[in-house]
């Protein structure tokens, strides 16, 4: 992505502790790629540095990432994305954390303890501000997860966020390339049909209850083929193949798909 000129790398799979080094390597490859391009294009590509933005869910993870980037690479983030417990898909929270926040139920509109995670957002912003001061630059903090309407956006701004990231609300739009059956699942879903489920990746995830999840409730779904997509994956023990489930979603085969979505779908 960096080699071909990506503007920003947003990284959320675990702790991206070596991301600055990967950017450096990517920049070198980009310069080599554009060496024979017209001088004007080459200069522009050579000078532009891809921005990096880690996704975090706690002040602790933000502190670890930014401290190690500072110590090991003498650099910091260009932006930080906070993914909250109401987000869709894989979540950066343990099941215990979700339970403590009241975010593991099918009625999160009644059980979610927003004020607890609001404090976490404020703490993350404080961590980021330390590196803003050290590097003398603005590091925007973006809040994601459960952003549904104007009130949610305004609330994020009041907490000190510079912006919000919205995913679920745009899935059903004409511009989204998801298959129609996937969009209809979002439109028809009721709050009590959105639930936390298990993932072979070792993280809890939020998805729409469907035939696939009901089969999973009865036991593991046999894996037909291994794609080597996860470094630590034993096809005999995992509950299902995450790749097959997501491919089915992309194809619109909703009865055999993992339909990830946010709490406010």
Where are these regions (language model features)?
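Active-site entrance/lid segments in N-terminal catalytic domains of soluble metabolic enzymes
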Residues: 1-134
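Residues that cap or flank secondary-structure elements
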Residues: 11, 144-145
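Gly/Ser/Thr-rich loops at beta-strand to alpha-helix junctions
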Residues: 15-16, 147-149
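Conserved active-site-proximal phosphate/metal-binding subdomains
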Residues: 77, 87-142, 148-265
């Amino acid at each position: 992505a960096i080699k071909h000129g990506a503007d920003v790398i947003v990284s959320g799979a675990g702790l991206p502790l070596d991301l600055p080094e990967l950017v450096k390597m990517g920049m070198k490859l980009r310069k080599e790629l554009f060496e024979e391009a017209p001088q004007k294009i080459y200069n522009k590509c050579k000078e532009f540095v891809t921005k990096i933005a880690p996704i975090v869910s706690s002040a602790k993870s933000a502190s670890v990432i930014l401290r190690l980037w500072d110590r090991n690479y003498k650099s910091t983030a260009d932006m930080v994305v906070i993914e909250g417990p109401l987000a869709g898909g894989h979540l950066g929270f343990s099941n215990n954390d979700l339970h403590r926040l009241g975010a593991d139920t099918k009625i999160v509109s009644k059980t979610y303890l927003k004020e607890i995670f609001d404090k976490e957002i404020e703490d993350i912003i404080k961590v980021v501000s330390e590196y803003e001061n050290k590097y003398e630059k603005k590091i925007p903090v973006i809040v994601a997860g459960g952003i549904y309407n104007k009130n949610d956006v305004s609330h994020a701004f009041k907490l000190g966020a510079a912006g919000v990231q919205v995913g679920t609300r745009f899935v059903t739009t004409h511009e989204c390339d998801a298959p129609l059956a996937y969009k209809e699942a979002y439109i028809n879903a009721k709050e009590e049909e959105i639930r936390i489920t298990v993932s072979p990746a070792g993280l809890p995830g939020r998805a729409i209850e469907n035939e696939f999840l009901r089969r999973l409730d009865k036991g593991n779904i046999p894996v037909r083929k291994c794609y080597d997509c996860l470094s630590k994956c034993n096809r005999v023990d995992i509950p299902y193949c995450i790749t097959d489930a997501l491919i089915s979603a992309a194809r619109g085969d909703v009865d055999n798909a993992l339909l990830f979505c946010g709490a406010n779908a």
